């Protein structure tokens, strides 16, 4: 078991970072619900300060609805939507943005206090500052994503959705890793673990699979090919190709779903190899073995949930649960990679 230097740790800082990570997890879940209910384009303006308040009068609601009526999603998809129907989708997007503002405040204000009190271990200060910058960037990316669906499209661009989710998950991983560092302090032992590279590679693979899932979501590809293990009776879909390489990889429903399936099978195989090798390795003890088992278990549960979600044609509840499962898998894979980075 690795021992740590107590002088280089801060439990209050760690607890704060874990809380922010939990809030980012909630953001990912609410974001999934916002997407699945087609609510993401209901607020057509970006007002970081004034936008924190919802419409406060019937006149304000009508004005907001009129703005929504000007975009293609209303004109081509929801021309019969009433004001009451608009309110339903508005609240999802508003809640998602409000939660984002709250996460920013819960991160920035304690950060300033901890810096003044010099409670943050010196080696983590720049990382904490970088995460503040990433949080601000995420807000800009969110609007960049929404803006792609306000003029020519009836939904946001899949690659922008992938960027938005990917940045959220990257911040989630970094928060967990930094919280673990703050909780435990610097390790006394600096020997390089043979598991470090493999664990980081697996974490990267899980992250990449999450990005592929975002492309599936952005293209509504979960609503086609709802059989398994084949795709409309074939292993390789006949309409895999799109308009060029990028059109295939980012915009073909058949391609993005096939890629997500194939990489899921690869992750399943990698998880089996991971847990078998971890169980046989005498140098990996205690938490390392337990976390390896947990990683494999969550991979299998997430894969089963993905198949269920697909075959059920993506009901909102299962779609949100599958997105939450991706974040849980990332969290467990992060904990495993962090724990085995040294003996």
Curated annotation (Swiss-Prot):
Q: Which Gene Ontology MF annotations are present?
A: metal ion binding; oxidoreductase activity, acting on NAD(P)H, heme protein as acceptor
Q: What is its EC number?
A: 1.17.99.9
Quote a single Gene Ontology cellular component term: plasma membrane
Q: Which reaction does it catalyse?
A: Fe(II)-heme o + 2 A + H2O = Fe(II)-heme a + 2 AH2
Task: Spell out the subcellular localization from the entry.
Answer: Cell membrane
Q: Where does the chain bind heme?
A: 260, 322
Question: How is the subunit organization of this protein annotated in UniProt?
Answer: Interacts with CtaB.
Q: Which pathway, per its entry?
A: Porphyrin-containing compound metabolism; heme A biosynthesis; heme A from heme O: step 1/1
UniProt keywords, alphabetically: Cell membrane, Heme biosynthesis, Iron, Membrane, Metal-binding, Oxidoreductase, Transmembrane, Transmembrane helix
The identity of this protein, by name, is Heme A synthase
Which family, according to the similarity comment? Belongs to the COX15/CtaA family. Type 2 subfamily.
Disulphide-bridged cysteine pairs: none
Coiled coil spans = none
Per the record, the domain of life is: Bacteria
The record's HAMAP family line, in alphabetical order, gives: HemeA_synth_type2
Looking at the Swiss-Prot or TrEMBL record, what is one Pfam family this protein matches?
Answer: COX15-CtaA
Per its UniProt entry, what is the enzyme's top EC class, as one word? Answer: oxidoreductase
Membrane topology (UniProt): Multi-pass membrane protein
**Per its UniProt record, what InterPro entries does this chain match?**
COX15/CtaA_fam (IPR003780), HemeA_Synthase_type2 (IPR023754)
């Amino acid at each position: 078991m690795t021992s740590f230097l107590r002088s280089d740790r801060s439990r209050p800082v760690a607890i704060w970072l874990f809380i922010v990570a939990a809030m980012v997890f909630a953001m990912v879940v609410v974001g999934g619900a916002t997407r699945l209910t087609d609510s993401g384009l209901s607020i057509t303006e970006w007002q970081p300060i004034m936008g924190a308040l919802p419409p406060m009068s019937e006149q304000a609601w009508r004005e907001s609805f009129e703005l929504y009526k000007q975009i293609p999603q209303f004109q081509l998809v929801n021309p019969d939507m009433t004001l009451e129907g608009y309110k339903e989708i508005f609240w999802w997007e508003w809640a998602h943005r409000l939660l984002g503002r709250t996460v920013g405040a819960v991160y920035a204000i304690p950060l300033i206090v901890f810096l003044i009190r010099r409670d943050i271990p010196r080696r983590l200060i720049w990382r904490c500052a970088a995460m503040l910058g990433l949080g601000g960037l995420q807000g800009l990316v969110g609007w960049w994503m929404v803006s792609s669906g306000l003029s020519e499209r009836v939904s946001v661009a899949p690659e922008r959705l992938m960027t938005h989710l990917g940045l959220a998950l990257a911040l989630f991983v970094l928060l967990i890793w930094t919280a673990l560092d703050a909780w435990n302090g610097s390790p006394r032992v600096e020997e390089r673990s043979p598991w470090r590279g493999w664990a980081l590679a697996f974490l990267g693979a899980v992250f990449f699979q999450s990005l592929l899932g975002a492309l599936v979501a952005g293209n509504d590809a979960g609503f086609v090919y709802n059989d398994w293990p084949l795709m409309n009776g074939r292993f390789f879909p006949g309409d895999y190709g799109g308009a060029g390489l990028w059109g295939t990889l980012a915009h073909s429903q058949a391609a993005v779903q096939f890629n997500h399936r194939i990489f899921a099978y690869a992750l399943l195989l990698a998880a089996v190899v991971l847990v078998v090798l971890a169980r046989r390795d005498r140098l990996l003890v205690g938490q390392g073995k337990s976390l390896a088992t947990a990683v494999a278990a969550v991979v299998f549960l997430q894969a089963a949930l993905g198949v269920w979600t697909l075959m059920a044609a993506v009901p909102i509840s299962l779609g949100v649960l599958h997105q939450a499962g991706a974040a849980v898998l990332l969290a467990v894979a992060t904990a495993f990679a962090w724990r085995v980075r040294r003996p």
